[in-house]
């Protein structure tokens, strides 16, 4: 007998990248150097990522809707899977941006990767302790970007699987007769 698909379960399937065309990872790249911004943008696009680039930590906060003065984007509509930021920037450093992102309830779970041309161990340790996903030395290589992308894809898949399992448990609680029939394969 054919399995009955409940509307909530169908909704999950329709939004899954596993069953439709996969949504590219969206990366927010932050760097004050025009050359470095273009370089990282190119690496990310070659790795099949959607990329948004900004030239400062302040602009990144504006883009995310986390600035105090003016909210440019409502973060309920914004899906960013990864933030890559330079460490040394005028105004606000990448470390300060990292702290603000990790303080935000809307974006604290988004991985932040710090990039720098300076290999200063206390700086690297401080960023990692504050919650940075990784610290990359410039010039960033394509292999670095691919490793990050693959790691994020695994996390996204795990997150999606957990959401399906949660919805199935909710469905069992809401439709206990259906769950019993499903188990009995009637």
Curated annotation (Swiss-Prot):
CDD domains reported for this sequence: REC_typeA_ARR
Gene3D superfamilies in alphabetical order: 3.40.50.2300
Domain Response regulatory: residue ranges: 26-153
Record PTM 4-aspartylphosphate, positions in chain: 86
One Gene Ontology biological process: response to cytokinin
Any one of the GO CC terms: nucleus
Protein name according to UniProt: Two-component response regulator ARR6
Source organism phylogeny: Eukaryota, Viridiplantae, Streptophyta, Embryophyta, Tracheophyta
Gene: ARR6
């Amino acid at each position: 007998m054919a399995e009955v698909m409940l509307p909530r379960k169908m909704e999950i399937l329709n939004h899954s990248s596993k069953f439709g065309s996969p949504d590219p990872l969206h990366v927010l790249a932050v760097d004050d150097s025009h050359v470095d911004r273009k370089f990282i943008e190119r690496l990310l696009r070659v790795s099949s990522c959607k990329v948004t680039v900004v030239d400062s930590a302040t602009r990144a906060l504006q883009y995310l809707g986390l600035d105090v003065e003016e909210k440019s984007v409502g973060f309920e509509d914004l899906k960013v899977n990864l933030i890559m930021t330079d460490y040394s920037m005028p105004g606000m450093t990448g470390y300060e941006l990292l702290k603000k992102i990790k303080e935000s309830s809307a974006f604290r779970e988004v991985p932040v990767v710090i990039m720098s041309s300076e290999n200063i161990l206390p700086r690297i340790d401080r960023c990692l302790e504050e919650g940075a996903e990784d610290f990359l030395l410039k010039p960033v290589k394509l292999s670095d970007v691919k490793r990050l992308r693959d790691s994020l894809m695994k996390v996204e898949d795990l997150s999606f699987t957990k959401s399906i399992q949660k919805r199935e448990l909710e469905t069992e609680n809401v439709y206990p007769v259906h769950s019993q029939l499903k188990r009995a394969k009637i």
